[in-house]
Amino acid sequence: YGSRALGDIFNMLHNGIVVETGNEVADSILGKAGGMNGTMWTINLILLALAYGGALERCGCVERLFGGLKHKIHSVGSLILATLLTSIFCDATMCDQFLGIGVPAPIYADKYDELGLGRNMLSRSLEDAGTLWAVMFPWTGCGAYQTGVLGMSPLVFFPYAFVNLLNPIFAYVTAAFGRNIFWADGSYTNIFGKTKAGKPAGAPEEAHAKALANLEARRAAGKAPKINA
């Protein structure tokens, strides 16, 4: 393209190019170079999804729907389940992965402290659902990108996305049975029910102190496992 005029180069960048190599397979692959114009549908959908999700966030719809739910939560398993479902709900209705994580986090953060859990437990629960399920809906930013790249709706490969489908289930079931849990003092209860000491996750100082105090109280009451020697 060294002999092309500058205007032609910008036109190719914007509208794409047509490649004719004489090889049918190569043409089918290289001929898809659609330039910036070829990505506009995806970009427009992402921008609309962000605007819509931001409006819902400012309205506080999710907080009103799920804010009262956390007062009925008294176990680690039910808290993890509520976090997972809220995160997936936000993905589906707010159309963006970041809102699927950022909106539920402040709703349940103090509940994790109340049950003596580490903030990394909250982070992992949000990732288990909010990140993995964001790509499962065609109308989210992630889903729109996948549609543009793969040329198919996420609903087509939905039944085969085993990690995305099974990870939230695994997270809830293990937590419900008191397994796979990060505690505020850095200890971790593994899949076999053994609790080992570890390094505490980062958290606001006041929240961390509250979580530690609650963890000690729950251990004294037999509601949380003690560290195995």
Task: Label the predicted regions.
Residues 78-91, 115-136, 160-165:
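Alpha-helical transmembrane segments of multi-pass membrane proteins
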Residues 49, 69-107:
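Hydrophobic alpha-helical transmembrane segments of multi-pass integral membrane proteins
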Residues 34-43, 69-84, 115-122, 154-155:
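Membrane-interfacial loop-to-helix junctions in multi-pass transporters
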Residues 57-66, 99:
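Juxtamembrane/interfacial segments flanking transmembrane helices
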Residues 2-61, 80, 84, 88-89, ...:
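Core transmembrane alpha-helical segments of multi-pass membrane transporters/permeases
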Residues 15, 64-74, 106-114, 124:
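Short amphipathic alpha-helical coupling elements at transmembrane boundaries
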Residues 114, 143-229:
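Juxtamembrane and boundary regions of transmembrane helices in multi-pass small-molecule transporters
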Residues 67, 97-111, 140-151:
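Re-entrant/interfacial helical elements at transmembrane boundaries that shape
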